[in-house]
């Protein structure tokens, strides 16, 4: 890649002023727009003005553009929308490498007591470590499912929001919760759960404090009780009512394991999908993580209601939870995005890896035609944007959308000679990330974070992990 900054200062490349914006121009690159028509260009241009995409097309950029502050030669590169992560647990970044041979329930029972010791300082470090891995793998927008809030843990959600703002990432945090402890027949220890009313009040406070409904919002909040085996029906129902009264989305875990299926049938007399439906938890404003153990009826209900799915292939394999029926979901019209899940069940935390693993796992179950490279890329971009309710703002490269984009090198020693640049990205080795823009601002350059000190993040993560283990 060559860069011409002769017409302006890189530091002032994006002002966010959409009335008279400076422009970033990328030319001579392959482009996968992931728009509704899957438009691609073998050699094209992308023009960014302020925090919006101004133009995408074949050949060089239009002549006569004013206030071009950065011009990039994208020869040998593929430009795609920034990836969108639909499920994570940032606090787990400081508990990686534990419970390595467990199924979900045993893994949780092992780690709940450890997580009971987290605090806001630890979670700030963990969030930055998690976000660093995401950004360096091409992710521009992420959610996080925070559901452990120890009584003396401080402002955990605020610490996460501050951490991602410092890195420049678009964020959709959730205020999660648990109120069904072991004394009531739930899985988490009582020390990890909250009072139902207190959890709902804290969720309302988080929405009022942090949620931004504007088009280019960098923070939007979601209500997210944890799971059927850690949350009472009262909290699930109350959270749904609260979220809809405030116009925010809903998120939880659903149909992840056979143990969850057995728990729901024994305790509620129905499977997870029917149980959650009975509490108002199906709809276009809802997405659920995993959704592995679903029959045709469950998939049909998700499709009919527009309920979304966060598919987490690496995590599902790590704890041997099963293989989600993603091709069947897509065929039925279910919105599906990709998630890395928490780093305690997916130590790499890289969303780019999930493109490949989603394809491989789908084919393992359904054969070589089960999922294509372009379908995998769509899951990680437009699919994730739809699941998060932001399909009009992000997820594809189209004029008027927000300038969240990734520029991948596909002519290096590991990718040169691969005929199809999308296949190079999805099926090849992890492609070097030359540039990542979030809201029109550079957040990754030449594979490294451009707004923070990576070594400082590493030191803070190490200290936080050691402090937690010492508790």
Where in this protein do the model-derived segments appear?
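Glycine-enriched alpha-helix->loop->beta-strand junction motifs that scaffold or abut catalytic
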Residues: 168, 240-248, 281-284, 301-310, ...
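Active-site microenvironment of metallo-dependent hydrolases
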Residues: 1-44, 48-54, 64-65, 381-471
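Metal-coordinating catalytic core of metallo-dependent amide/deamination hydrolases
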Residues: 153-291
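His/Asp/Glu-enriched, well-ordered alpha-helical/loop segment
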Residues: 278-285, 327-412, 427-430
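Histidine/acidic-residue-rich catalytic or RNA/ligand-binding cores of hydrolases
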Residues: 183, 258-270, 298-303, 320-329, ...
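Alpha-helical scaffold segments that flank or form the walls of functional sites
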Residues: 96-145, 150-170, 200-215, 462-470
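Active-site gating loops and adjacent loop-to-helix segments of metal-dependent hydrolytic enzymes
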Residues: 94-125, 152, 180-196, 217, ...
